[in-house]
From Swiss-Prot:
Species lineage: Bacteria, Pseudomonadati, Pseudomonadota, Gammaproteobacteria, Pasteurellales
Gene Ontology cellular-component terms listed: plasma membrane
GO biological process, one term: electron transport chain
Chief location category: membrane
Designated name of the protein: Ion-translocating oxidoreductase complex subunit G
Cofactor(s) needed by this chain: FMN
Amino acid sequence: MKTVKISAYYAILLALIALICTALSTGIYLLTKSKIEDEINKQRQALLLEVVPQAYFDNPLSENCQRPNSEKLRAQRIDRLCIATKNNQKTAYAFETVAPDGYAGRIRLLVGITPTGTILGVRVLEHQETPGLGDKIETRISDWILSFSQQQLRSDNLADWAVKKDGGKFDQFAGATITPRAVVNQVKQSALSLLDELNQEN
């Protein structure tokens, strides 16, 4: 009988400890949730400014983002589209897209583009490429990704939109052609899809 009472006591004690720990964890989460969300929003806004400079818009760009309705855009793996406006005129777009064929898997990109096809900037949001080789797509490692800035995408220069090994004008990396090829191809194809969609709207 005494053993049963002791066991019940410890069971209740453990339950109370678990309850207190859960309450503390929940409290910490609730206290830090807004700070974490604020930090994520700040990082997102900073990245948006890297691909669509402030001079292009006077609207709250990060608040004007949504999943595109167009099946064509979604088929090109454009899963988030932000619209920049200035004086109520659409001046640029920022979109997230995924290159599915990186050396080590998917490469998530953020692309800024004008309605006339000028690439304002490209940044890598996420990747798993090989350190020392494919990770040169990051600005902290290399300035390669900056080579997209101010490049014009037109029907008469599509052949240029490839790595040099494939006859284009973009550099590849020594020992790592697959990664830059995947990025160039995805920027090209997704941007062309967006421009085609915009032309149909007009």
